[in-house]
């Protein structure tokens, strides 16, 4: 929070506050969708709390000289768990592991009616699919209703995070060339990874080649 760019590199951890001049083009599509300016620097505002669940953010590091500003944000769901000489470390009680499924999808036409500031909340409820993807995968999920789309309170967000967490992968390991994940699903479904989509990715499920889909305007 309001700290150095690329702090995650110092700690060998992934981080959503990041400066990098070589990024996957799809991230330039995704971030404006959810109300975040993106060029070579990503720095989502703390007020966009639902993005933290969607992007599997577990901790926020707050410089000690910025604690007063952090407290003024009055953000729910963050608990102080540790500290260093320079930082206070807060844990996200609504953290969702990297890689999870949905019970619902939302079409591009329906998603266009959602404001940028509420987009993160809606994307915790439903997977954004193109019309072609709805034809291919729509039978796996329900079409999000307008009533469900409009339920975007913090309490709704907590419930959505809980639901996504219950369907999350059991392990996720980043590698030099990509990542591996394990999941135990009751039925066939799409698994969202908040990784920028790129044509160079390939995937296998139980050793069988699988399609990698671009969803949520830039994730996969």
Tell where the protein language model's regions lie, with residue ranges:
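Active-site regions of enzymes building and remodeling cell-envelope glycoconjugates
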Residues: 9-16, 72-83, 87
